Amino acid sequence: MKSLQKGFTLIELMIVVAIIGILAAFAIPAYNDYIARSQAAEGVSLADGLKVRIAENLQDGECKGPDADPQSGVVGNEDIGKYALAKIEGDYDASKTDAGAPNGCKVEITYGQGTAEGKISKLITGKKLVLDQLVNGSFIAGDGTDLADKFMPNAVKAKK
């Protein structure tokens, strides 16, 4: 009398393991890109916070204001996040009046200099995103940016 087969054969198990390996080969790089994109987006959030400081400084005709001084309550020209450090740079150009033209003020975002050093994606560590502020107050990626285009937030990509 024949006995009934119970369980899976070795070949069936090997096929399942091979399929999982193939799926992981596609999923892991995509997941790493997703993590890098989400961490890169923090830099733009920091830059948005610096818009108010730039607007205040522009009242005095400058992009940068005084350096931070906790004693007097001056907040300074930079903001630090979990994954990035954002600094106000540039020289204001009052001659620019077209809403879509850069006004000379920039925010330089350096990834890997935040409070979570070592916990940032290696794909963006040490990269810079330089945002030029336009006359209308919005930002666009400018010269000096070495952050890969696939990690750059859509809000600041140059229209082509």
Swiss-Prot record:
Report the superkingdom from the record: Bacteria
Q: Which UniProt keywords apply?
A: Disulfide bond, Fimbrium, Membrane, Methylation, Transmembrane, Transmembrane helix
PROSITE patterns the record matches: PROKAR_NTER_METHYL
Cysteine disulfide links = 63-105
What is one GO cellular-component annotation here?
membrane
* Membrane topology reported for the UniProt record: Single-pass membrane protein
A Pfam family that this protein carries is Pilin
GO BP field: cell adhesion
Q: Which residues carry this modification: N-methylphenylalanine?
A: 8
**Propeptide per record: which residue ranges?**
1-7
Q: Where in the cell is it found?
A: Fimbrium; Membrane
Tell me, what does this protein do in biology? Major component of the type IV fimbriae that plays an essential role in twitching motility, natural transformation, and protease secretion.
Family classification: Belongs to the N-Me-Phe pilin family.
Q: How does it assemble?
A: The pili are polar flexible filaments of about 5.4 nanometers diameter and 2.5 micrometers average length; they consist of only a single polypeptide chain arranged in a helical configuration of five subunits per turn in the assembled pilus.
Q: What is this protein called?
A: Type IV major fimbrial protein FimA
Give the source lineage, highest ranks first.
Bacteria, Pseudomonadati, Pseudomonadota, Gammaproteobacteria, Cardiobacteriales
